[in-house]
Amino acid sequence: MGKAVIAIHGGAGAISRAQMSLQQELRYIEALSAIVETGQKMLEAGESALDVVTEAVRLLEECPLFNAGIGAVFTRDETHELDACVMDGNTLKAGAVAGVSHLRNPVLAARLVMEQSPHVMMIGEGAENFAFARGMERVSPEIFSTSLRYEQLLAARKEGATVLDHSGAPLDEKQKMGTVGAVALDLDGNLAAATSTGGMTNKLPGRVGDSPLVGAGCYANNASVAVSCTGTGEVFIRALAAYDIAALMDYGGLSLAEACERVVMEKLPALGGSGGLIAIDHEGNVALPFNTEGMYRAWGYAGDTPTTGIYREKGDTVATQ
């Protein structure tokens, strides 16, 4: 095994240079870089991949630029319903929450489910009460709200549409997938993954996508790979996208790059799915494939300068240490 490494994403979609100002680009790049740098420092200090991805996603949830935690989109009923998942590649233990509205950081609740319950997934009020009983603060759902997200809900209603994230500059938001995630390989050779989302603008209350589902939007196994997905959740569920990467590597003998190409560029589009994913294999190779115009992403080996990206760049989808 080589050096420890982390990768994060903040959603994929029809991201156009023409629609985004330099100032807007810099806001995203600075946020992504800072979060990856935090993860790199944690890895250098010998912290576990599980702790690193949990903290990275918590920071993404705290950033209103992304559709997770603060800045989450609205449901049709003008509420917020958040989902998250974490998975430890060393033990294959996982935890997830779905449809929570009063927990500031759903990824921390998912971690509690994994470590302090016999379950893998908990939903709604039961998940919230479980987290409250273990020290998490109850917050008003209003903390997740932003004026931009509300404007996007109104626009979606006007169009009679359910959209994957928000509408309006700087993106063609009807095609933007609002999810955040992190994957990491630590100095002990352990992999971990975490994913969190606010879901779809104008979604029906109770809808759950791929993000909190082990094997669909989040997966980690030390024998192969850690994966976090972003895209059309219903299709990622049907395709078991995250696990399919691992299966193609384990049973098909494909490399990380080959498995990602097969899933993201062939299998998902065949089902009408768009989006992308981030993945790190057990050897420390990194892949960041997407079949949309862009994906907010960043990655870096411990001790190196982070690499960030928004748009499609030639040769940037796979990195080998």
From Swiss-Prot:
Enzyme Commission code: 3.4.19.5
Post-translational modifications reported in the UniProt record: Autocleaved. Generates the alpha and beta subunits. The N-terminal residue of the beta subunit is thought to be responsible for the nucleophile hydrolase activity.
Superkingdom per UniProt: Bacteria
EC category: hydrolase
GO molecular function, one term: hydrolase activity
Record's note on what induces expression: Repressed by cysteine, an effect that is attributed to CysB.
One Gene Ontology biological process: protein autoprocessing
InterPro entries: Ntn_hydrolases_N, Peptidase_T2
Binding locations of substrate: 207-210, 230-233
Alphabetized UniProt keyword annotations: Autocatalytic cleavage, Hydrolase, Protease
Catalytic activity line of the entry: Cleavage of a beta-linked Asp residue from the N-terminus of a polypeptide
Site entry: Cleavage: 178-179
Protein name, per record: Isoaspartyl peptidase
Species per Swiss-Prot/TrEMBL record: Escherichia coli (strain K12)
Upper classification of the organism: Bacteria, Pseudomonadati, Pseudomonadota, Gammaproteobacteria, Enterobacterales
